[in-house]
């Protein structure tokens, strides 16, 4: 993919269908319940209507696409796990033996594992070979990748969105597997937002105090190694990003292009979503944050997106583990829209709601 082709791709992305959203909002008002009583489920159903163009959208088959890649910054000792874990966990995902893939199996969701930059030969075990290069450069001393490589990785993500559309997937989760990618994600988020590295860097898989201090020092070196144009997402990805983040950025763009609801997982996923929205603000219409990741920096990225996470479970596994859970909530939101009776159908007089409807808001005191 060339930069010109990327711009053409982005220009074809359209915002959600506002007319369908208005119609869905009207239907919500007709359902036999107090206004707003289903909380975020109501907003989800309205947003899904805008994505699909259907007032009563339906959820069918769902999929989690996982982009696996290694990160050269691991050489600096920023992770408690060795580089080899990237490949092994990617293989385990195909066997449905990781946290995310076990949940997906329990719910009957598809899982697609894509090698976009594993630093090893990958055996034929069900992993899709889309390797751009064997891991990234060490961002403490060099760029992670070139612009053509970043574009190639983004194209891998776009391909997965197109494949999801061809396979009639109704929601696509965007996950990752890559030792060291909390470091690259923190660096990308720091550049995009201007936040200090201290505010966006966590312990990842469980660093000791010494390892955590080293991680922050390495990232400061990476961010001062050369000037990075925060308004040029490609430059940010090339300087301090990862192939997984680039591919996920492309996948989020692809979901918007294909009009597929996109499930955002944790820290790495939300940073990639922010990259995509920075490139194309319309992408935001297609994003659903699955859970409030416990990883430092997640909340900043979510706030920049202007979206609220669906679930609050203290999770920080990554992989796309929040996506299968979000799919179930989206199914519930769709089920209400399609199956719940209206006041007329339920033979309920709704005059008692006039006072609530006339008010500016409806709140419930929490204990």
Where would I find each of the regions flagged by the language model?
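N-terminal loops that bind phosphate or other acidic moieties
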Residues: 1-367
């Amino acid at each position: 993919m060339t930069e010109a082709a990327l711009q053409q791709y982005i220009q074809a992305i359209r915002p959600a269908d506002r007319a369908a959203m208005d119609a869905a909002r009207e239907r919500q008002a007709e359902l036999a319940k107090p206004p707003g009583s289903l909380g975020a489920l109501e907003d989800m159903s309205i947003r899904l209507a805008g994505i699909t163009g259907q007032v009563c959208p339906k959820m069918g088959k769902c999929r989690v696409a996982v982009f696996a890649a290694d990160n050269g910054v691991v050489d600096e000792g920023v992770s408690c796990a060795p580089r080899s874990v990237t490949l092994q966990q990617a293989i385990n995902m195909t066997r449905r033996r990781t946290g995310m893939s076990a949940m997906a199996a329990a719910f009957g969701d598809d899982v697609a594992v894509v090698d976009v930059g594993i630093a090893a030969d990958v055996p034929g075990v069900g992993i899709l070979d889309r390797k751009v290069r064997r891991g990234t450069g060490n961002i403490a001393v060099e760029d992670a990748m070139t612009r053509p490589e970043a574009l190639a990785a983004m194209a891998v993500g776009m391909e997965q969105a197109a494949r999801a559309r061809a396979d009639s997937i109704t929601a696509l989760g965007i996950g990752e597997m890559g030792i060291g990618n909390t470091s690259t994600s923190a660096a990308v988020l720091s550049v995009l937002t201007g936040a200090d590295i201290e505010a966006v860097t966590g312990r990842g898989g469980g660093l000791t105090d010494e390892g955590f201090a080293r991680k922050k020092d390495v990232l400061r070196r990476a961010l001062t190694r050369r000037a990075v144009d925060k308004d040029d997402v490609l430059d940010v990805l090339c300087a301090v990003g990862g192939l997984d983040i680039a591919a996920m950025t492309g996948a989020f763009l692809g979901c918007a292009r294909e009009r597929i609801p996109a499930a955002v997982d944790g820290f790495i996923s939300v940073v990639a979503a922010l990259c995509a929205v920075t490139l194309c603000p319309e992408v935001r219409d297609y994003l659903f944050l699955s859970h409030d990741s416990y990883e430092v920096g997640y909340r900043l990225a979510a706030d920049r997106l202007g979206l609220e996470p669906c679930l609050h479970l203290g999770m920080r596994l990554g992989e796309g583990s929040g996506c299968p859970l979000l799919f179930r909530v989206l199914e519930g939101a769709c089920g209400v829209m399609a199956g719940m009776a209206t006041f007329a159908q339920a033979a309920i007089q709704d005059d008692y709601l006039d006072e609530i409807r006339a008010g500016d808001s409806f709140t419930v005191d929490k204990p």
